[in-house]
Amino acid sequence: MSTGHVSTIDTPISPFTAIVAMDGAVLASGWTASADDLLPQVSPSLRPTTLAHRRDLGEVTRAVRAYHAGDLDAIADVRVRQRGGEFMGRAWDALRTVPAGKPISYADYALLAGRPTAVRAAASACARNAATLFVPCHRVIRTGGATGNFRWGADVKRWLLAHEA
């Protein structure tokens, strides 16, 4: 039996909720007011069996507030924990190296993740990313410059990209 902590923070976009492990690592996050939207995204082997609601998640809450207030690097050192195959892990790690204000294409993302021909797998890594914001999948766009898909909606992705520009 494991317990995760959850908190919702008001942001200029919409409420932002994060689920963190007992050690403070982010398991899932996104622009929603409901932990129920996030829990299914957590790998079953990491998924908490109970959630304890908190007003403040310490480092995570500070980073979310600072990021939305303009400190775009505030999210860089927040610990995350996700499970996926070897490529997924490399791809999520690679995403954390993409600087704010410098979006990349899915093809460039596949190259950065070490598999230049695996564009679909790179897109899948974005889609399966549970730790949105901290693993900034919003920084991956289509080759022609279109924003592409985003779990939390095109308006949220456009806001994030404009905020980081």
Q: What kind of feature is each model-predicted range?
A:
Residues A18, V140-R142:
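Active-site and channel-lining beta-strand-loop segments
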Residues V119-T132:
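Regulatory, non-catalytic segments
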Residues T143-A165:
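…primarily DNA-binding HTH/wHTH and HhH modules…
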